[in-house]
Amino acid sequence: MKKTHITEQKFADLDLLPQVIEGLEKKGFDYCTPIQALALPVLLTGQDIAGQAQTGTGKTLAFLTATFNHLLKTPEHEGRKPNQPRAIIMAPTRELAIQIYNDADSLVASTGIKAALAYGGESYDKQLGKIEEGADILIGTTGRIIDFYKQKVFNLNHIQAVVLDEADRMFDLGFIKDIRFLFRRMPEPKDRLNMLFSATLSYRVQELAFEHMHNPEHVVVEPERKTGHRIQEELFYPSNEHKMALLQTLIEEEWPDRAIIFANTKHKCESVWGHLAADGHRVGLLTGDVPQKKREKILEQFTKGDVDLLVATDVAARGLHIPQVTHVFNFDLPDDCEDYVHRIGRTGRAGESGHSISFACEDYAINLPPIEEYIEHAIPMSDYDASALLEDLPAPMRLRTRNPQQRRSNNNGPRNGNRKPNQNRRPRQPRHNKEA
């Protein structure tokens, strides 16, 4: 996956403290993305912002940088105890909260500012212990934050910075009452730095900003199109008979460093997982019934590179923020047009390039016209040579026959023990536009 140039704005040229710049440089960040270049100069003057930017544009680093810098430059309130947060970052999902927390690690190390996590589905006592050790920044989901607040673990009297990430999804998931509950127990908006980020600045999001922020400046980074311009899109029309063989052949040809394969149902995901696992791939499975701890383990394996392929449903994959995903395969075209954009947006993030491959099969080709109407362009189409598809495919594994400790991932041994990359197979035939 190659890195593309982003903007000419260097972090080192902004009014950032040396400790913050050190933390950014440790992560390899030298130049700003467009949302960072627009938002940070505003935030560093102490001005609130309501930012519109798509997932994968670098907004997380923008608000983390501003939050750490603000806390370093602003004296903490007199009488504050170490477990009383100075900043709160609210996310719609626990996966996003965990990702934000992990993204903050280099800034935590370089500044000495402590961060803690609070989200449901994980040990209450473990999170409580971390907060009591000291939590300058509390990152989490609104429900668990409110639980701790009501248990008087901390109060919100010393909040000096607030981040609301993916505000539009907060509305979609019904969390807006929780957000207002927390805002109303913090100091006045003028006495804190407020940051709101959303994929769309709809009327209801702007109303929320007006109600709980202090004259926020709107910062908008419009995508050139709904699907990222760094994502190479490709479409095949496989028969149902060829669909699995085409997927496995393309994986052998592309040999992706890290790929997510989407299917529309839990049953289909399990079937795809079974074929890939039987063929020796290091593959994980995420469906709606995977327990939270197992889910986190699979995501950790995928992020570290112990698992190369992840098969997932849309519901299970919501909130995933995994860096350096090189490929996305739409084994099934989604029923919801927006899900297509969300799926392929897992790759080509924050200046990286990516590749999206979609199958318009006999069952789901009907979903293609509304998707192309929604994204406002036709997906480039490729033909395939059926005679070049893999034929020596083993019978799929079945979940119920596997050891319980291995039920959801197949990551033993070297990568793809049964196969090696083979770019000579060339199942593709010359590409052409559908209009031709």
From Swiss-Prot:
Catalytic activity: ATP + H2O = ADP + phosphate + H(+)
Gene Ontology biological process terms from the UniProt entry: RNA catabolic process
CDD domains according to UniProt: DEADc, SF2_C_DEAD
Chain ranges of the Helicase ATP-binding domain: 40-219
Motif (DEAD box): 165-168
Principal location class: cytoplasm
GO MF annotations in UniProt: ATP binding; ATP hydrolysis activity; RNA binding; RNA helicase activity
Compartments it resides in: Cytoplasm
Disulfide bonds: none
Keywords, in A-Z order: ATP-binding, Cytoplasm, Helicase, Hydrolase, Nucleotide-binding, RNA-binding
Residue stretches of biased makeup (Basic residues): 422-436
GO cellular component, one term: cytosol
Pfam family, one: Helicase_C
Motif Q motif boundaries: 9-37
Enzyme class: hydrolase
Positions with biased composition (Low complexity): 402-421
The enzyme's E.C. designation: 3.6.4.13
Region (Disordered): 398-436
PROSITE patterns: DEAD_ATP_HELICASE, HELICASE_ATP_BIND_1, HELICASE_CTER, Q_MOTIF
Quaternary structure and partners: Component of the RNA degradosome, which is a multiprotein complex involved in RNA processing and mRNA degradation.
Job of this protein: DEAD-box RNA helicase involved in RNA degradation. Has RNA-dependent ATPase activity and unwinds double-stranded RNA.
Assigned protein family: Belongs to the DEAD box helicase family. RhlB subfamily.
Protein name from the UniProt record: ATP-dependent RNA helicase RhlB
